[in-house]
């Protein structure tokens, strides 16, 4: 059975939504949960019927969202340090944390190390499109990149799309300010030349192409990726708020909204980041799923499902094998 370490107290809302998410996941799939935190606080939240699947790793401190990520290595008593250390010692198969994302990245990279052939890890996230989903990476691990970094991101994204998204030949694109090969800055142009080696590379793509369903994996540096991610979150929130405002304008609008309610629910679910759970940190020697600090129980549950799928798919081995084809 898969063993997953959960940073049980690192989110913005404390341990309650995290534990609720763990319990929901346990009711749906079998795995062993190692809760990292204060067991005196956590144990009363666990029902007797699920106690057999729960273990505890004591951690007396929480790495604050206000702390600098570079300080994560200094305090070995934090929940995120203890969780990552369990993975380093091979006592668990994966880590899920809704705590300080910078600390998670820093600890995972320095404590676990990088995969063979990977110079920098990348955070990957799923973005909804009109047909299914697009994998976007990097969305925050690296604000400044070299062309070789983006090439490695492309390989990792392609492998993830095949293994997890079940896309046999994922369409891979590079984010730029135009589709033409000559468009973009020096980084984009140099990266484009490297990515030509990849059979499934379809060329440059613009920001609007994320949502048309014609791209499965979109590669960019962490600065652009994070801006895109946050902008999309804001746009989605604004659109739903505008719809609510318009519905209130007349009785006919309210009737129409009532008739459209099932469709609105499907749309909201498709665009809701909580449905995707978390973002895998690709390129480190282990499975680390980084969840949003504001994750509710549903997001934590889905992040755990991601961790299970990642662990069972042997993605890291596949990434090293795929990179080996180009480095040989």
Swiss-Prot record:
Q: Would you kindly state one Gene Ontology biological process term found in this protein's UniProt entry? A: fatty acid biosynthetic process
Reaction equation(s) it catalyzes:
a fatty acyl-[ACP] + phosphate = an acyl phosphate + holo-[ACP]
- Chief location: cytoplasm
Domain of life according to the entry? Bacteria
Its Enzyme Commission number(s) read: 2.3.1.274
Q: Which InterPro entries match?
A: FA_synthesis (IPR003664), Phospholipid_synth_PlsX-like (IPR012281)
Q: What does this protein do?
A: Catalyzes the reversible formation of acyl-phosphate (acyl-PO(4)) from acyl-[acyl-carrier-protein] (acyl-ACP). This enzyme utilizes acyl-ACP as fatty acyl donor, but not acyl-CoA.
Protein name as catalogued:
Phosphate acyltransferase
This protein's species is Campylobacter jejuni subsp. jejuni serotype O:6 (strain 81116 / NCTC 11828)
